[in-house]
Amino acid sequence: MTGVTGTEDTKVIESKINELNIDKSKPEKTNKVNKSDDVDNDDVDNDDNDDEDNDDDDDEITESGNSASSSGDKKKKKNKNKNKKKKKKKIISIDSSYPEGIFPEGQWMEYPLEDINSYRITSEEKRYLDRQQNNKWQDFRKGAEIHRRVRHKAQSSIKPGMTMIEIANLIEDSIRNYSNNDHTLKSGIGFPTGLSLNHVAAHYTPNTGDKLILKKDDIMKVDIGIHVNGRICDSAFTMTFNDEGKYDNIMKAVKEATYTGIKESGIDVRLNDIGAAIQEVMESYEMEENGKIYPIKCIKNLNGHNIDDFIIHSGKSVPIIANGDMTKMEEGEIFAIETFGSTGNGYVLPEGECSHYAMNKNIQHLKPPSERSKQLLESIKQNFGTLPWCRRYLERTGEEKYLFALNQLVRHGIIEEYPPIVDKRGSYTAQYEHTILLHPHKKEVVTKGDDY
């Protein structure tokens, strides 16, 4: 991926310096983000790039160019500048960095079967057909580039002591800004931001009023979904803040297992074979805590999945254990390859207050039981369609006093709920995930970045 660095602010200063024949001795600061990130599009909180800093520089240039200025005037200006309130630089839409609509490709990988791979590479017809889907691939690549920048912001900003609401808002506001679009069905958030802690493996995002605070010894799964025209990029990573390396082994196990799953994936590959390879890697690791050894287990009832337009789980499940599923991956399919490791039972159950919801794809024969639930369903259709959502997103659309109607829709099977899923208390879980595109000749790990 190509690096792009924003330079508009420094050009203003340089032109003033040239006019005054003053040497510029201080080098410009830049921030490297996944090779493709530019300053304009990422560092919202970078004070070195604030507009107020540029005002300070202009004042200094004026002072040094005007020999008649008194030292008293200089001091007043400096004091005035010190008292100025810093402004945060707004994130700019991702489109401004790629005005031609051509976004960075992901990591290309060969398919595992050499005979299949050889056929695909030499088939000009297949390559031609793949090019016909360029708009589709560009949507995924755009979403992936937003994902890389958003998670860079998250990784550099999230600290113990923050509330889960603050963390969720940080991530989701970044997605909205990069997407530059408030219409959820055009582009933006693909599903609720997962921020599951410790023994909670997935499907936790804070509801309004949640007071939960991130602690230094927590292990947090950050699952972010971004879509462009319904093409969903699904990618997750795990964050820890313990300085003693307590979670190093479980994170290494899960990351290596995920990349094993990606390596084994491909056209005509059986899902069982992918799961068997993942399981072998994952269960070769163990974790030590307080002198006790815990084997790291695959969470057997959690899987990867294929993705369709506006549908995050489209029907095929990619197991993380050998489960006997002889279903094959097919050309043109999109898969989220994700693995979960645990020091607990390796099996999760629903527990806790629900925050995740999605509309049932097959509701033609189902009718809302009340006028209020009918109104709520129409709002859900207009704002989210079949994309998953959470209560906070519903409230953002202006909905109030909706819980009774929402529960009615759930009871009648019109809306499906996805509560947090947990292993046994006291255990630890980790997750890594990438979205892959199965092109005719190679696979593309579209969400791959420098971080994972």
Curated annotation (Swiss-Prot):
Q: What class of enzyme is it?
A: hydrolase
Superkingdom classification of source:
Eukaryota
Cofactor remark: Binds 2 divalent metal cations per subunit. Has a high-affinity and a low affinity metal-binding site. The true nature of the physiological cofactor is under debate. The enzyme is active with cobalt, zinc, manganese or divalent iron ions. Most likely, methionine aminopeptidases function as mononuclear Fe(2+)-metalloproteases under physiological conditions, and the catalytically relevant metal-binding site has been assigned to the histidine-containing high-affinity site.
* Catalysis performed (reactions): Release of N-terminal amino acids, preferentially methionine, from peptides and arylamides
The record lists a divalent metal cation 1 as bound by D223, D234, E433
Give the region (Disordered) as residue ranges. 1-91
Q: Which cofactor does it need?
A: Co(2+); Zn(2+); Mn(2+); Fe(2+)
Keywords carried by this UniProt record: Aminopeptidase, Cytoplasm, Hydrolase, Metal-binding, Protease
Q: Which NCBIfam families does UniProt cross-reference here?
A: met_pdase_II
Name of this protein:
Methionine aminopeptidase 2
* Gene behind the chain: MAP2
